[in-house]
């Protein structure tokens, strides 16, 4: 076994759900992989930490997307590895119907945060993070079109549109 194989990977989970904005799923993956490639070529082997990126959903069923692409989750919330970082992609159009149907993801976010995960919400994906209560008392942002609704739904969040 080489030293590279012995190094624990940085565990990154990206939540996937219906109506997510596909670019807020794919762009972070591309940027993370580019950073990983740069780090691998510019660090000593024993200093390099590989990334393990998993698409996490409430079930393993394919998730259709308005682009015509289906998203295949790697694991369910109940089997997902402990995450160092969780990315919550933006939601296409009105986030409220999506948030209301994703209580298992909201619960998982809260549990993961309690276990030490860092969480990044992208645009309207912050509605899921706020629904978990993780933004209460903290500054946050969302898509400008939903800012007023966000303020009404999550009055404890310091919205910075």
Descriptions of predicted regions:
Residues 135-161:
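A conserved active-site-flanking secondary-structure segment within enzyme catalytic domains
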């Amino acid at each position: 076994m080489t030293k590279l194989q012995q190094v624990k990977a940085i565990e990154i989970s990206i939540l996937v759900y219906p109506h997510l904005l596909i670019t807020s799923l794919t762009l972070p993956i591309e940027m993370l992989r580019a950073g990983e490639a740069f780090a691998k070529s510019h660090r000593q082997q024993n200093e390099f930490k590989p990334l393990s990126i998993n698409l996490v959903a409430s079930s393993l069923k394919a998730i259709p997307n308005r682009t015509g692409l289906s998203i295949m989750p790697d694991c369910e919330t109940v089997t997902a590895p402990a995450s160092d970082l969780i990315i919550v992609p933006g939601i296409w159009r009105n986030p409220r119907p999506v948030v209301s149907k994703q209580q298992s993801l909201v619960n998982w976010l809260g549990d993961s945060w309690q276990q030490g995960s860092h969480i990044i919400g992208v645009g309207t994906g912050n509605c899921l993070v706020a629904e978990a209560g993780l933004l209460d008392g903290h500054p946050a942002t969302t898509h400008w079109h939903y800012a007023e609704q966000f303020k009404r739904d999550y009055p404890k969040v310091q919205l910075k549109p």
